Amino acid sequence: KLSRYAMQNEDFKKIVGTVDMELPYSEMHKYLYLENQTNLLTTYPGVGGIKTGYTEEAGYCLVTYAKNEDVELIGVVLNAVNRKFDMLNMLDYAFGTYGIEVESGYE
């Protein structure tokens, strides 16, 4: 529910959906290149990002927002050996139940 609520905020949606960003040098910080670790943003059509994570208790985790046609999904993977692969399969299955075929960059 928290992710669904957060994705209603356009600023949040823009930030978590940003693939990469360059912050030029300033008096406050050196030059920074920031890259989103949710690489499904560039390989799975309709993915709008959200968050990767890891803790010893929860393992590798991934929360993902995706929209194709009129179907919006939020998937959550916890304690995954391969969170991206698990999410890819979950999104394919979920969109498939609505008759939506998505061609991702994954094999």
State what each model feature region is.
Residues 1-107:
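Domain-terminus/edge residues, biased toward the C-terminal soluble/receptor-binding domains
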